[in-house]
């Protein structure tokens, strides 16, 4: 049987998740040529963990306003972004996506604790599934901010943000947001 590759170009076999705690939640086992599962795999408490990571990222691009619900458009834009990433870095775009998610997920956050009418914030650890969700949300927010009312295309914005986040660069919106969240959590210890 032939190997299934993303967009018939990028192999799932080469992708490694370097963070041990995130490895069970970054799903690379459900392989598809196109990041569209169209199944009921999201049932249960940890249903998001069974969705392929490329599809979760594509679905996050569809949110908020003009592009909501246009999954085919989001898949085509992600395919163009994968081509740009591969031509700029000579790396597998799936590996760049996984590294960007690992680097932009905060490890600590703050929670509000209230007793007797008084509220205070305290530092808490973030679960791996929540860490991935925050990372994907921050990546897509940075991409939206970079391409809104700008000459840069959405595919170029995706490529720039993912490359910057995968190298842990300060140019990435998601990495800066992660550092801000962790700094606030550290001050509330």
UniProtKB/Swiss-Prot annotation:
GO MF, one example: structural constituent of ribosome
Keyword field contains Membrane: no
Pfam families: Ribosomal_S7
Subcellular localization: Cytoplasm
Family annotation (InterPro entries): Ribosomal_uS7, Ribosomal_uS7_dom, Ribosomal_uS7_dom_sf, Ribosomal_uS7_euk/arc
Alphabetic keyword roster: Cytoplasm, Ribonucleoprotein, Ribosomal protein
Principal place of residence: cytoplasm
One BP term from GO: translation
Any one of the GO CC terms: cytoplasm
Stated family: Belongs to the universal ribosomal protein uS7 family.
PANTHER family assigned: RIBOSOMAL PROTEIN S7
Record text on subunit structure and interactions: Component of the small ribosomal subunit.
Protein name: Small ribosomal subunit protein uS7
Organism the protein comes from: Encephalitozoon cuniculi (strain GB-M1) (Microsporidian parasite)
Gene designation: RPS5
């Amino acid at each position: 049987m032939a190997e299934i590759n993303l967009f018939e170009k990028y192999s799932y076999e080469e992708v490694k998740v370097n963070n041990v705690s995130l490895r069970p939640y970054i799903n690379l086992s459900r392989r598809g040529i196109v990041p569209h599962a169209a199944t009921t795999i999201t049932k249960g408490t940890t249903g998001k963990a069974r969705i392929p990571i490329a599809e979760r990222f594509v679905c996050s691009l569809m949110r908020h306003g003009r592009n909501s619900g246009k999954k085919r458009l989001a898949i085509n834009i992600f395919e163009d972004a994968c081509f740009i990433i591969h031509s700029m870095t000579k790396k597998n775009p799936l590996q760049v996506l996984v590294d960007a998610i690992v680097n932009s997920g905060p490890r600590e956050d703050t929670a509000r604790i209230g007793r007797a009418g008084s509220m205070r914030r305290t530092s808490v650890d973030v679960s791996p599934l929540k860490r991935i969700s925050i990372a994907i949300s921050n990546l897509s927010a940075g991409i939206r901010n970079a391409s809104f009312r700008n000459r840069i295309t959405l595919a170029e914005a995706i490529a720039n943000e993912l490359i910057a986040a995968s190298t842990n660069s300060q140019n990435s919106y998601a990495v800066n947001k992660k550092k801000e969240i962790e700094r606030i959590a550290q001050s509330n210890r």
